[in-house]
Amino acid sequence: MALKIRLSRGGSKKRPYYHIVVADARSPRDGRFLERVGAWDPMLPKDKPRVKLNEDRIQHWLNQGAQPTDRVLRFLDAAGLKKRPARNNPHKGEPGKKAQERIAAAKQAAEDAKAAEASA
């Protein structure tokens, strides 16, 4: 049984509240879970504690092999329970292949025009 530590949505419409739960990976988002190990209230102001974690139970489930989702891993990293690897994408923000070809073609056309102007 693959275990996940993930968010389960509660609250009402436009007022989300999430429980941090340990659940089987196959169960639905708000469905059956094994244990509730924390809560996250994104509606609280930033200066108030939004995340509440039961750290010893989370550590127990991590030792049992439960995998946290990306959002929960951010919370665990902030609490110092599990390290979140830094993401590295050196190509982010670079133009795509076709855009690079267009830029190269425009640069070549500008150089050709400059060379033609110099020889004339």
From Swiss-Prot:
Keywords: Ribonucleoprotein, Ribosomal protein. GO terms for biological process: translation. It comes from the Bacteria. Residues 80-120 are annotated as: Disordered. Residues 81-90 have a biased composition (Basic residues). GO terms for molecular function: structural constituent of ribosome. Pfam families: Ribosomal_S16 (PF00886). GO terms for cellular component: cytoplasm; small ribosomal subunit. Residues 91-101, 109-120 have a biased composition (Basic and acidic residues). Belongs to the bacterial ribosomal protein bS16 family. This is Small ribosomal subunit protein bS16. It comes from Bartonella bacilliformis (strain ATCC 35685 / KC583 / Herrer 020/F12,63). The lineage of its organism: Bacteria, Pseudomonadati, Pseudomonadota, Alphaproteobacteria, Hyphomicrobiales. The gene is rpsP.
